[in-house]
A protein has these predicted regions:
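Ubiquitin-like/PB1-type beta-grasp interaction modules and other compact soluble beta-rich domains
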Residues: 1-79
Length: 80
């Protein structure tokens, strides 16, 4: 199966593109999506601890993804 990962800000900059299709085994989790990104060229520049949304809803690392899902990887937000 495959999911489309939307990359924002520093994530898009590090991987050199705004999105990527990630092949995964059925039953994969959000954590496995992030692990797949960490194996891509440029991953050494990925910020830690992103916010993740699956189909426009915030997700936990343990949530399962399904074929065709849209996974958004968003940098952590800081403010003051």
């Amino acid at each position: 199966m495959s999911v489309t990962v939307l990359l924002f800000a520093a994530y898009a900059d590090a991987l050199g593109r705004p999105s990527v299709d990630v092949p995964l085994a059925p039953g994969a989790t959000v954590r496995e999506v992030l692990d797949a990104l960490k194996r891509m060229p440029g991953a050494d520049r990925l910020p830690p601890s992103p916010l993740v949304a699956v189909n426009q809803r915030y997700a936990r690392l343990s949530d399962t993804v399904h074929a065709g899902d849209e996974v958004a990887v968003i940098p952590p937000v800081a403010g003051g």
